[in-house]
């Protein structure tokens, strides 16, 4: 059994999720990654996730230690992929994943992706897609280790992202 549990985020999680995102911004900056350094994501983005029922938290030892948006509504910018998706199947999307620094290197991000895969399977969805910055090698390694395949690039918020897909 994994040391992490997952649940749908509630309004009560907004401040904690926002703090995790802010902590992740600092971590990325300190590690030379330009991703999330322009103000986004912010509390408003997370509040939108919660309103749409797409926000999820990861708990460890009774504390919220991770946040991600897991959506099944599609991602419009993925329609303009420069490259090729593995499939044309309906898909889940993981956005805005942030893991508390205390859980980094302990399998938290892979566990969150496995949780997202389970949510997909519950909905009879057999594809999951993710995008990240080209300089975020940490996330790219996590994705590769979890069986995601590089598919090309997309433009998101006026920034080019690299896109991955995994068939499940």
Language model: regions and residue ranges:
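Conserved acetyl-CoA-binding loop-helix of GNAT-fold acetyltransferases
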Residues: 99, 105-118, 141-145
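Conserved beta-hairpin
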Residues: 54-68
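Conserved GNAT-fold acetyl-CoA-binding loop/helix
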Residues: 25-45
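Conserved beta-strand-loop-alpha-helix junction that forms the acyl-donor binding cleft
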Residues: 104, 130-139
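Conserved acyl-donor/pantetheine-binding loop and adjacent beta-alpha core of acyl/acetyltransferases
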Residues: 69-96, 101-104
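Conserved GNAT acetyl-CoA-binding A-motif
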Residues: 113, 120-132
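Conserved catalytic-core motifs of GNAT/GCN5-like acyltransferases
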Residues: 131, 144-163
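Conserved N-terminal entry element of GNAT/NAT acetyltransferase domains
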Residues: 1-15
């Amino acid at each position: 059994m994994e040391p992490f549990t997952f649940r749908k985020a509630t309004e009560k999680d907004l401040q904690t999720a926002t703090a995790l995102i802010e902590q992740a911004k600092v971590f990325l900056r300190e590690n030379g990654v330009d991703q999330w350094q322009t103000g986004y994501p912010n509390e408003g983005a997370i509040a939108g996730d919660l309103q749409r029922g797409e926000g999820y938290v990861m708990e460890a030892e009774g504390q919220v230690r991770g946040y991600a948006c897991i959506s099944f509504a599609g991602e419009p910018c993925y329609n303009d992929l420069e490259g090729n998706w593995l499939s044309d199947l309906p898909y889940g999307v993981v956005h805005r994943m942030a893991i508390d620094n205390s859980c980094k290197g302990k399998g938290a991000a892979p566990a969150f992706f496995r949780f997202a895969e389970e949510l997909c399977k519950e909905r009879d969805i057999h594809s999951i897609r993710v995008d990240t910055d080209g300089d975020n090698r940490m996330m790219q390694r996590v994705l590769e280790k979890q069986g995601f395949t590089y598919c090309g690039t997309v433009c998101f918020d006026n920034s080019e992202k690299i896109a991955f897909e995994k068939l499940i």
